[in-house]
Amino acid sequence: MNTHGKLSKRIKQKFIKQLVAPGAQAAIDQMKFEIASEFGVNLGPDTTACANGFFGAEITKCLVQLREKLGSRY
């Protein structure tokens, strides 16, 4: 791995899963479980990679729709 790859990996590890709003983790987790249940996905270690990928895409769509709905208020 080149130096750029190592730096990129360190940056990702440092910043991954840091929420912008402190205390938002509970709300994010609740949203994940609600969206998963809407699609019949049981979150857990036995969930397939395919189901996780589909689920991740749906979360992204929901977040984009929420941001569009809220507009520039935040």
From Swiss-Prot:
The keyword DNA-binding applies. GO terms for biological process: DNA topological change. InterPro entries: SASP_alpha/beta-type, SASP_alpha/beta-type_CS, SASP_DNA-binding, SASP_sf_alpha/beta. It comes from the Bacteria. It holds the Pfam family SASP. Belongs to the alpha/beta-type SASP family. This is Protein SspS. It comes from Streptococcus pyogenes. The gene is sspS.
